[in-house]
């Protein structure tokens, strides 16, 4: 089944996307075409958005799902005229919150993002630069600055997790790929041993690893199920021998991997 989902906002659309994506992810047997419409901050833009929604409804034969974070009530009312099923995020939550707090909302466009301090922004950028500069074992001499060092076989999810930890939490995360020689030795590489307390391992089901590697190097030894089985078995054995905490990333999104790592290690987020 195919449905269209619109994320509509009078700002960047990040909040509508974040909540909408989380809800849609619960319906794994439905294919969603996702469309973000940011800065819908006038009635004219709202009418154009309605036209797109109605066209999608006609093509799909189903109502598009609309997630909106529009502050202006007139613009929201205009969007509501469309042939879509509208989930009004601010309207749903602000009114009961106003009643509970005994205070009216200021209804400020883009407020959720304007409150981020300069220090948080700088921390996020520093962590992101660190993740990129210390990707794939490139610069181990800066590992003393790391909050965490992810290790694992090639294509087990290290890089996207490091980037997410940096962007979302301001965590400085480096990653180091464990080669066939490393896992054959069954010891941490020499360059990592002085940072043992920062090391966290990722693993992955061999079948999933083979699929991912075949996208990169199809029909190669590197992507064969035999090679993937071997590397995963050996790296998990090394984790246990070296007493390295680790997580199987197969069934988790990068958001879930990051959250579980923080829970397992006790690392605190640096930005909020």
Swiss-Prot record:
It comes from the Bacteria. Keywords: Kinase, Nucleotide-binding, Serine/threonine-protein kinase, Transferase. InterPro entries: Kinase-pyrophosphorylase, PSRP. The keyword Transferase applies. It catalyses: [pyruvate, water dikinase] + ADP = [pyruvate, water dikinase]-phosphate + AMP + H(+); [pyruvate, water dikinase]-phosphate + phosphate + H(+) = [pyruvate, water dikinase] + diphosphate. Its EC number is 2.7.11.33, 2.7.4.28. One of its GO terms (molecular function) is ATP binding. ADP binds at residues 152-159. NCBIfam families: PRK05339.1 (NF003742). Belongs to the pyruvate, phosphate/water dikinase regulatory protein family. PSRP subfamily. Bifunctional serine/threonine kinase and phosphorylase involved in the regulation of the phosphoenolpyruvate synthase (PEPS) by catalyzing its phosphorylation/dephosphorylation. This is Putative phosphoenolpyruvate synthase regulatory protein. It comes from Hahella chejuensis (strain KCTC 2396).
């Amino acid at each position: 089944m195919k449905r269209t989902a619109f994320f509509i906002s009078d700002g960047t659309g990040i909040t509508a996307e974040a909540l909408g994506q989380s809800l849609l992810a619960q319906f794994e047997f439905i294919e969603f075409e996702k469309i973000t419409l940011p800065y819908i901050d006038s009635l004219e833009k709202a009418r154009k958005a309605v036209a797109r929604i109605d066209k999608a409804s006609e093509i799909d034969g189903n109502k598009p799902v609309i997630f909106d974070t529009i502050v202006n009530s007139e613009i929201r009312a205009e969007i509501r005229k469309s042939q879509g099923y509208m989930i009004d995020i601010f309207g749903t939550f602000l009114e009961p919150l106003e009643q509970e707090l005994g205070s009216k909302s200021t209804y400020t466009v883009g407020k959720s993002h304007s409150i981020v301090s300069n220090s948080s922004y700088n921390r996020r950028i520093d962590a992101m630069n660190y993740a990129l500069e210390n990707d794939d074992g490139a610069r181990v001499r800066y590992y003393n600055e790391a909050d965490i060092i992810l290790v694992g076989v090639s294509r087990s999810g290290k890089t996207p997790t490091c980037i997410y930890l940096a962007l979302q939490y301001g965590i400085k995360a480096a990653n180091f790929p464990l080669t066939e020689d490393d896992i054959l030795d069954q010891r941490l590489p020499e360059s990592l041993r002085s940072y043992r307390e920062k090391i966290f391992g990722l693993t992955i089901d061999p079948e999933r690893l083979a699929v991912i590697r075949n996208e990169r190097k199809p029909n190669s030894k590197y992507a064969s199920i035999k090679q993937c089985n071997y590397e995963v078995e050996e790296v998990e054995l090394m984790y246990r021998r070296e007493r390295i905490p680790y997580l199987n990333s197969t069934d988790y999104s990068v958001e879930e991997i990051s959250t579980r790592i923080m829970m397992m290690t006790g690392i605190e987020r640096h930005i909020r």
